Amino acid sequence: MGRPWVDHPSWEVVAEASSAVGKDVARLLLDAPMEELTQTANAQLATFVQSLVVLDAVERVGLSPAACAGHSLGEYSALVAAGAMPFSEGAALVVARGDAMAHAGEDAPGTMAALIGISDDDAEAACHRAEGEVWVANYNAPGQVVVAGTSDAVAAASEIARDLGARKVLPLPVSGAFHTPLMAAARPALRKALGDVAFSAPEVPVVANVDAREHADPSEWPGLLSAQLCGPVRWRQTIEALSGLGATTFLEVGPGGVLTGLTRRCAPEAQAISVAKPDDLDALLDAVAGGHAADVWHHDAHAHQGEHLYMSERVVVSPCSGIFMPESSLAAPGTGLLPGTAGHATDPSHVRTGDLVGRVGVTEVRTPFEGEVIRWLSVAGERVQEGQPLVWLRVSGERR
């Protein structure tokens, strides 16, 4: 799952996640057998972390979102991306959510099915006529609705949906009836975990799943995330809301590309791009260079301190091989420590996102983060390799 990213600088996000949750997330992403990886709790943690690995990679090239939303679990990634909660607390919250949902699925077994080629109204009618515990769980796109409930009720609603014109019914390989009242048993544990999170006002608009509205008040998000467990994901309406905010380019970060396809159906006039592996960054940069993504992606992320993961320390790495020469203006005042002299800075220089920290050969090295230089990791005149750490920063904007 995560192997394409293992040699990318953003892979360090995985170590931060492992430290935050006390689990070997790298093993989960690289070596876990499919049976283990697809367990609800593991799948949610792996997806969350990999999505933020991709977000980190996107922000390393100088882009940050102008608005955010996430489908189901993705809402947690969206809140981290918008600066509304710290990465470490988000990771711990995802673990609590996954465990709670897995237990709820055991207590109240259920399943889900995608109905293709049917309207929202007909999908709702199929659920009502089934006369069992079945509800619409996802309003994904025009002509695509997901229903969830007990196995018998979902089967009955699926047959009624076929009678109402559904072209196809696709049973989903899930371990519970997510986003329905059958998940009610998960809410107490999630509420408790939400109480431990220090939510902040989002730095950019975040549109919620449960009502497809922007919520800027941080005190509202615990209730919204709790309600999401038992209420439908209104994804089609969410894309419409983002379009109403002026978005014409949508970027999906993380494994797969399902949301990209859904977005194209919800907003056919918009540009939708998926970044799932490092090679996809080139297509993203091509889109930005063509001026197509300026509405939803800020180029150069000063307003977000260069990143949204709020990790305490980061490194700037060499983009290529060659001789490293540091930027002379970054000498640490009062320490006698020259730039590029490996060692600690007791009175560190401050750098902003995009600042020049040196050159490798003729290639400029600019920091994708804002923070304080606390240690030079390569000395002036040293021959460095691509990906070799050059300078160690304590990032600004961290939230502990």
Which functions belong to the PLM regions below?
Residues E372-L390:
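Short, compact, well-ordered microdomains
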Residues M1-A123, K168, L172, T249-D279:
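FabD-like malonyl-/acyl-CoA
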Residues E59, R162, E240-G246:
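Non-catalytic positions within long, well-ordered alpha-helices that form the structural scaffold/packing
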